[in-house]
Amino acid sequence: MRFTEQLAAAWQRNNSLLCVGLDPDPARLPASLTTSGGAIFSFCRAIVDATADLVCAFKPQIAYFASQRAEDQLEQLIAYIHEAYPGIPVILDAKRGDIGSTAEHYAKEAFERYQADAVTVSPYMGFDSMQPYLVHPDKGVIVLCRTSNAGGSDVQFLETNGRPVYQVVAERARDAWNTSGQMGLVVGATFPQEIRRVREIVGDMPLLIPGIGVQGGDIEATVRAGRTADGTGMMINSSRAILYASSDSDFADAARGVAQATRDQINQYRN
């Protein structure tokens, strides 16, 4: 099944636009897990088990695994999600961007080694740096557009032919790059006006929207700006607010509580 089909099915099946980011910080893992090997996998698996019926996607951030030499645990985690919760897509948050020959290997890393359903990429080096991902027809390619960090404005608001760069990226994704319907865009919840503008440009293209929770993005403004006509079209990501809802042995139950409250708050504004 194609990534976009998986995502649409998950929106409906779980009545959810919530994406849970899996960013396991070793310094914040519960003490009950840190005394044994495989703590990162065990922590993330518990979060997945507690929230799988509440989400439309999971998004592991590769740096949190690679910095701990835990790439094998990332492979194990994605395989576990696919086996235990088939139909919930996994987005590898890698934000890759390099020349085509190198991008071919990054694509193999994401889609063959890790078996992710989608990957985040940077458009800064142009279409030929993204093309190697698009030759995997069932996979999603989610392009950075208007990111949630304040410093994104340094580049994304520079003007070219009277338009800010982030709008040009959205237009290119709509017109020239998305030839096989595999693309989505990253647009931060911290900038709802830009979410609305991107939605106007790209129509029903899926948007990955980080920035609610700890980063302070407003859920109501985000949903109203980014929803499509049928009340979907978004993967609204929350990571730290869910993962670290408790530092004790009840961390998974606490994560479920925050995830359910977030999912339900999002749903208030979908229609």
Swiss-Prot record:
Alphabetically list the UniProt keywords: Decarboxylase, Lyase, Pyrimidine biosynthesis
GO BP terms in the entry = 'de novo' pyrimidine nucleobase biosynthetic process; 'de novo' UMP biosynthetic process
Tell me where the signal peptide lies: none
Among Pfam families, the record links this protein to:
OMPdecase
Q: Which CDD domains match?
A: OMP_decarboxylase_like (cd04725)
Looking up SUPFAM superfamilies in the UniProt record yields:
Ribulose-phoshate binding barrel
PROSITE patterns linked to this entry: OMPDECASE
The active site annotation covers K95
InterPro entries assigned to the protein according to its UniProt record, in alphabetical order: Aldolase_TIM, OMPdecase_AS, OMPdecase_type-2, OMPdeCOase_dom, RibuloseP-bd_barrel
Which Gene Ontology molecular-function terms are recorded?
orotidine-5'-phosphate decarboxylase activity
Specify whether Cell inner membrane is a keyword of the entry. no
> Which domain of life does the protein's organism represent?
Bacteria
Assigned EC number: 4.1.1.23
Spell out the reaction equation it catalyses. orotidine 5'-phosphate + H(+) = UMP + CO2
Pathway where it operates: Pyrimidine metabolism; UMP biosynthesis via de novo pathway; UMP from orotate: step 2/2
Name the family the entry cites.
Belongs to the OMP decarboxylase family. Type 2 subfamily.
* Protein name per UniProt: Orotidine 5'-phosphate decarboxylase
Q: Which organism is it from?
A: Ralstonia nicotianae (strain ATCC BAA-1114 / GMI1000)
Q: Which gene encodes it?
A: pyrF
